[in-house]
Amino acid sequence: MKSLKGSRTEKNILTAFAGESQARNRYNYFGGQAKKDGFVQISDIFAETADQEREHAKRLFKFLEGGDLEIVAAFPAGIIADTHANLIASAAGEHHEYTEMYPSFARIAREEGYEEIARVFASIAVAEEFHEKRFLDFARNIKEGRVFLREQATKWRCRNCGYVHEGTGAPELCPACAHPKAHFELLGINW
């Protein structure tokens, strides 16, 4: 691959790296808040997403060739709010990344002859779209009071011990390990 030095793509990589790195930290902070708010599954989703953002940043960082590079970029300077607000803010950031930032960065990389980097930008955008959907789905569940309650009987799994409960809602305490309702999630069987 030809050198990135002085290209717009080099600046875009560093901008995306900085954004992914900051998102990782925000998601770790938001995960802590979710746990405080009684949403262990959402806390774990924030942690998982933070790890995925770290991997995006690492992939991008490996393209850089060293030295100092000045970029001008705006990043969210928000606060740690309640879990619902944190999910909405996170979804907005992911939306920007997959609808505007990464498609633009991929186009510029192609124009400058960096096809591999363009593919990476486009691939990261796919992950960001999934992140947005998941954040919005959890936000909707909080707003509608559906995190631990459903109209139809379903199966709920304790994330701490694996106990499975069937009913319209998660139990207040797990009968197997005595952990609170915060540790339950809908049982998802994807194998």
Swiss-Prot record:
Signal peptide region: none
Residue stretches making up the Ferritin-like diiron domain: 1-146
Residues that bind Fe(3+) 2: 53, 94, 128, 131
Localization of this protein: Cytoplasm
Binding site for Fe(3+) 3: 158, 161, 174, 177
Cofactor requirement: Fe(3+)
SUPFAM superfamilies membership: Ferritin-like, Rubredoxin-like
UniProt-annotated binding residues for Fe(3+) 1: 20, 53, 97, 128
InterPro entries, alphabetized: Ferritin-like, Ferritin-like_diiron, Ferritin-like_SF, Rr_diiron-bd_dom, Rubredoxin-like_dom, Rubrerythrin, RUBY_RBDX
Pfam families for the chain: Rubrerythrin, RUBY_RBDX
Source organism, top-level taxon: Bacteria
GO cellular component entries: cytoplasm
Keywords: Cytoplasm, Electron transport, Iron, Metal-binding, Transport, Zinc
Record carries keyword Amino-acid biosynthesis: no
Predominant cellular place of this UniProt entry's protein: cytoplasm
Domain Rubredoxin-like residues, every copy: 153-191
Cofactor note: Binds 3 Fe(3+) ions per subunit.
Example GO molecular function: oxidoreductase activity
Function: May provide oxidative stress protection via catalytic reduction of intracellular hydrogen peroxide.
Subunit relationships: Homodimer. Possesses two rubredoxin-like centers and two non-sulfur oxo-bridged di-iron centers per dimer.
Protein name, per record: Rubrerythrin
Taxonomic classification: Bacteria, Pseudomonadati, Thermodesulfobacteriota, Desulfovibrionia, Desulfovibrionales
Gene: rbr
